[in-house]
Amino acid sequence: MSTVPCGVLRSRIRYDPWTVRSIAALVALALLQAPLALPPTRDQLFALFGSYLDSLRVQAGIPGLAAAVIDGDGIVWEQAFGQQDVARSLATRTDTPFHLDGLTQVVTASLVLRCVEDGRLTLDTPIGSFNPGSADAQATVGQILTHTSGTASDPVFSYRPDRFDALASVVSTCTGSSFRLAVARTLERLAMTDSMPGPDAANDSSLAGDAGRFRNIIDRMAIPYSVDAQGRAAPSRYPAATLTPSAGLVSTVLDFAKFDLALRKGNLLSADTVAAAWRPPVSSNGRPLPHGMGWFVQTYEGEPVVWQFGSGAGASSSLVMTLPARGITLVMLANSDGLAKPATLASGDITASPFARLFFQVLIK
């Protein structure tokens, strides 16, 4: 596979955390200078955020990135950066489809929790009740959702997205359909017309009526790239070849905003269920663990932050952050793995992400 000099990255610059920190410092300086004049308007803050986000994208080795901010009424800001196809110089758009990778888990969690709400299963039900041959047969549904093991009084956290795949049989048993079809129905219900339940969905006979739309989504999907230390982008392949509970969902930032709104407005789950999903289990020493049911949960300067990330090695990445108290969400999708590194985020600290820190610094402070 040939390596294409990635013009969208502007220069062959190694991803450098010191450079990333300098961007954050410039943001802080810009905001410190703001009180000397009139306080910045919301549009000015979004313009500043977009400018620094684009600079950070370049430093992180991301050819193309789409982002949106959603409040309780809908999308308040959206912007796309760079190129979704470097060889053809195709600019990224906010309706460009990307692989969601690990963000698929939040959709899976919503399906499972809806089954719990409807009384079709409990969080204490063992996975073996649905799939006796599962490697996680002794684990409960709740343990899979929270990435924990051990006992209820002493849970142990270990982030392993592949464990989520055991939930396919749970959803299938609850809904009476395949896992893919259950996801497809959710996408249809939310009018997520630029999304598809797996990159191979067009080949599923149970979804034959949508095959043409799915092929159109594939044709418009961002090309995945592996970017080297010199900023050169080589076309690669998305790791997920099909839909599983942990990966494979294809969507856009505009479509994901519909899911976010439906979740926060109670159209998918009750407010009590969402609150429970966003409440982390507590270890035996009284400390909260970093992952709720489908979402990471932590606090930033005393404020709750709910988030999840996805990473397709050498191909794609995604990040979503919600601040429940403010009713605001940021979602970002990228066609390289520069947006979300598992080595830094899997432990459950969103502040390890320079993109999250930029969001906090510009739009939340």
Language model features by range: what are they?
Residues 58-66, 87-143, 152-162, 244-247, ...:
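Short active-site loop at a secondary-structure junction
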Residues 45, 49, 100-104, 108, ...:
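Hydrophobic (often cysteine-bearing) scaffold residues that line and stabilize catalytic clefts
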Residues 36-79, 177, 234-365:
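Catalytic loop of the DD-peptidase/beta-lactamase superfamily, centered on the K-T-G motif
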Residues 92-97, 214-220, 347-358:
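Glycine-rich, flexible loop segments associated with nucleotide phosphate handling
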Residues 81, 85, 126, 134-314:
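Short, surface-exposed loop or secondary-structure junction motifs
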Residues 1-92, 101, 114-121, 146, ...:
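N-terminal leader/targeting segments and the immediately adjacent pre-domain N-terminus
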